[in-house]
Amino acid sequence: LRQGVSQRLGIEYFDTKVNINDLGYLQRNDNFRIRSAHVRTSSGMSWARSNQFDVRGFVQKNAAGYFTGGGIYLTNRLTFNNLSSMTFVTSFTPKAYDDLNSFGNGTYRTAKRREVVMRYSSPSNIDLTFGGGVGLREEALGGNQIKIGGGVTWRPNDRFSAELKYSWADRKGW
């Protein structure tokens, strides 16, 4: 590819008989997943330092052949000349089968989900920084979630920092 463009492809396979959860948390053992990421970074704009556009996606199925997950994610991160940034994220997750959260009581179908998020971050090269964001997300079992969050970080030197974060969510599907 060319400068400012990267492409990644990954394939994962976990057998049903091999249990490697002792190495750390894994979502599931019987899994076949294909994932890809395409990132384009551009610079040289008069009003911004850089813009990074990111497209990612994955599809996965379990050993029984059920489609257990997938999604496409679009992210655009714009870094301004003063090093503050705006990030926009949107995603889509199609209907899938969930055979883990029923705790052995069968397989059920989850709904398709969409999400939209917008975040702002002040420049991180100063002692006092702040950021915040807002998002709207559809829940896996129905209903919507609105989430608002942010925070302030004080970093007077490289050896000390203090952080205050807040988060508020309103869930309609729970």
What residue ranges belong to the model's regions?
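Exposed, low-structure sequence patches enriched in small/polar residues
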Residues: L1-W174
